[in-house]
């Protein structure tokens, strides 16, 4: 115990006072504190109010004019999807490839075998007229009591395919399948007249045979003339007319019997 008391006496100096230490350590506002000289001029009443540097500049006088940007944004006008004007668009029939003027010219070319055919018009792929003529041919057969729509379309497809292969072998320029179908379909028009006669009287006599032969020659001559004009096959009309006569002969047999 005597040693412990000596240790405590040595640890604390005789001149040490706790009151003096606390006064020296926490006396920040006094003149003797370590922070009194550094923060003596700081005003604590301004604490919490921050002023940006831009606000310290003097304000510009108001001139009465609203601020206007130098370059205004002008949105681009939307482009119409269907063009500038609907009146400039082609008609719907023309977009579908149906031209009544060309249909009429081709029909007149078939009805007048001696008329010179326009190769530029005949080389077009126009299936509107041939479809109408095929339906008319089947309708006249129906009036005669013959339901032969399947035979008409089947023979037409086989005949167009055969003529397509033959003309591509004979011509130098070549021909499309649509052009062949268009020409053969238009030249079916005289065959409609033959089937119409079959509604009125029988074609199994001598008059019917002569009329049938004339109609076959008419159809084959018109088709061969158009093919020669469209494909520039001068001097080969008889070679083209022969397979055409075979095709239209089958249609004539359907009309007669």
Swiss-Prot record:
Related illness: Microcephaly, epilepsy, and diabetes syndrome 2: An autosomal recessive disorder characterized by neonatal or early-onset diabetes, severe microcephaly, and epilepsy.
Gene source species: Homo sapiens (Human)
Name of the gene encoding the protein in the UniProt record: YIPF5
Recorded consequence of changing residue 181 to V: In MEDS2; uncertain significance
Subunit structure, interactors included: Interacts with the COPII coat components Sec23 (SEC23A and/or SEC23B) and Sec24 (SEC24A and/or SEC24B). Interacts with YIF1A. May interact with RAB1A. Interacts with YIPF3 and YIPF4.
Record Pfam families: Yip1
Protein's name according to its UniProt entry: Protein YIPF5
Tissue distribution of the protein: Ubiquitously expressed with abundant expression in pancreatic tissue, islets, beta cells, and brain. Highly expressed in coronary smooth muscles.
Keywords: Cytoplasmic vesicle, Diabetes mellitus, Disease variant, Endoplasmic reticulum, Epilepsy, ER-Golgi transport, Golgi apparatus, Membrane, Protein transport, Transmembrane, Transmembrane helix, Transport
């Amino acid at each position: 115990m005597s040693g412990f008391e000596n240790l405590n006496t040595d640890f604390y100096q005789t001149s040490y006072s706790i009151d003096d230490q606390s006064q020296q350590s926490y006396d920040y506002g006094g003149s003797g504190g370590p922070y009194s000289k550094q923060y003596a001029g700081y005003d604590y009443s301004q604490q919490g109010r921050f002023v940006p540097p831009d606000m310290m500049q003097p304000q510009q006088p108001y001139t009465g004019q609203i601020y206007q940007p130098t370059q205004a944004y002008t949105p681009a006008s939307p482009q119409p999807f269907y063009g500038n004007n609907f009146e400039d668009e082609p008609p719907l029939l023309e977009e579908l490839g149906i031209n009544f003027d060309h249909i009429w010219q081709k029909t007149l070319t078939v009805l007048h075998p001696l008329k010179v055919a326009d190769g530029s018009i005949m080389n077009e792929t126009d299936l509107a007229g041939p479809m109408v003529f095929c339906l008319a041919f089947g309708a006249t057969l129906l009036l005669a009591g013959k339901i032969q729509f399947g035979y008409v379309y089947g023979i037409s497809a086989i005949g167009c395919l055969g003529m397509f292969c033959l003309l591509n072998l004979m011509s130098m320029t070549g021909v499309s399948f649509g052009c062949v179908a268009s020409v053969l379909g238009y030249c079916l028009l005289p065959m409609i007249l033959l089937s119409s006669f079959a509604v009125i009287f029988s074609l199994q006599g001598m008059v019917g045979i002569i009329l049938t032969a004339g109609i076959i020659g008419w159809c084959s001559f018109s088709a061969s003339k158009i093919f020669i004009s469209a494909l520039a096959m001068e001097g080969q009309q008889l070679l083209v007319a022969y397979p055409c006569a075979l095709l239209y002969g089958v249609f004539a047999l359907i009309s007669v019997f």
